[in-house]
Amino acid sequence: MNRRAYIIFTREPVAGKTKTRLMPYYSPEQCRDIHCAFLDDFRDMSRDVDADIFVYYYSENGEYPIVRDIFGDGVTYHEQEGSDIGYKMYNAIKDVLSLGYYSCVLTGTDIPKLRAESVNYALDSLEDYDCVVGRTTDGGYHLIGMKEAISEPFHLEEYASESVYENTMDAITSMGYSVLAVDEYSDIDTPTDIREFMRAMRSDLRLRKSRTGRFIDANAKVSVIVPVYNEEKTVIDLQVQLKKNATDAEVIFVDGGSTDKTAELISPSFKLVKSGKGRACQMNEGARAASGDILFFLHCDSRIPDDFINQIRKVMEKHDYGCFGVRFDSKHFFMWTNRIISNFRAWRRGIPFGDQGIFIDRGLFEEIGGFEEIPIMEDVEFSTTLRKKGYMPGKTKSRITTSTRRYDGKWYQVMITEYKMWSFRRKYRHGKDVNEIAKEYGDVR
């Protein structure tokens, strides 16, 4: 028998009963599955904890087949007892210490970042302190440990407030016991917590490889935002593509005041948002209406890969934003060179344009303030802002095919159009008034 005990405090995962604060962001079944992912990660983590392991579970019918299947043999199982969460934790600690253990630490399971080193540190610290408590970033606590069962810290009236940690620490010290604040972690209770975990994963291989990380990546919510203005010739074809290949994504069309039948042609199965005219304004309005973790800005004259949602998710495992790159629906030599230059600029210089299918972490989009609402060059300004902040786009394996409608004509007319587009960008880089450039560009958006 080890001198130390570690209690994993959880419940039997049941759809509609567990992680309910994540609904409707996740379905009841997904809430159950992410809870199972937490338990898988805790099983693996607990193998490196220098203590005997106890799993205290809650179950409405007393049965715990999922918990048992995940943790297997080698741990001791007990059903939680008590009238509320505080008394249940106290009774678990009291029961385990009554078995003769010198010290005991208890944690919940919705802290997928928790490391075994932190649990061992808490147990080690009980050699010198009466109690240890680990704060969560939302003001609660994820860990509590004791050498003797003290009931007062568990008599709180409210366990869902931002003062739980402080009230618990006050209760311990008011009784004359010594207490150490140990490592702070963030838990996962809300969709915001999911998004913060997603961003943390991109720089932490351990989190990406965890069962929780793999689940979150595979179920990342993608919002497809399509700004439209007089697109009756293209909007039906894009909807056909999206109905086929975006079944698990949110699709939002943002109409900037079309004077043709564009808005009427948009299927009620997609969300239609009205906004002022201007692509930047429309995309920002779409982002405000979106619920996804990842925002994908798509032009209406695009042809997208069948598996574009999975390609976005794959890139976003390691990157905060990315793009598809572009190819054109023309074999014209000058369009081929345009493709090469555009993709080189996106991936080597970090300046993707809008027709290359930019997608971005929602939190990062909000952090930089979205698109600057200028009449033209909003994509250049957006990418430049990200590059200045140190962000470079990730690259998908496939390309978006975009229309060459702006380049119609004979070869010399294509060259003239290419030159005009280059000159517009050059003027913008050199500080010419963007409104003057927009007048030269013409009213095509």
Predicted regions, residues:
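A conserved acidic beta->alpha catalytic loop
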Residues: 60-63, 255-263, 302-303
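Acidic donor-binding/catalytic loop of UDP-sugar-dependent glycosyltransferases
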Residues: 109-122, 261, 300-314, 384
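Glycine-rich, basic loop-to-helix element that forms the pyrophosphate-binding segment
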Residues: 86-92, 274-290
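Short, well-formed alpha-helical segments that are part of the catalytic scaffolds
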Residues: 14-46, 230-244
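Conserved donor NDP-sugar-binding/catalytic core segment of glycosyltransferases
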Residues: 125-132, 306-334
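Hydrophobic helical membrane-anchoring modules
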Residues: 202-220, 384-445
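A recurrent flexible, glycine/aromatic-enriched loop bordering the glycosyltransferase active site
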Residues: 132-138, 321-333, 342-360
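Short aromatic/hydrophobic "clamp" motif used to bind/position activated sugar donors
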Residues: 104, 295
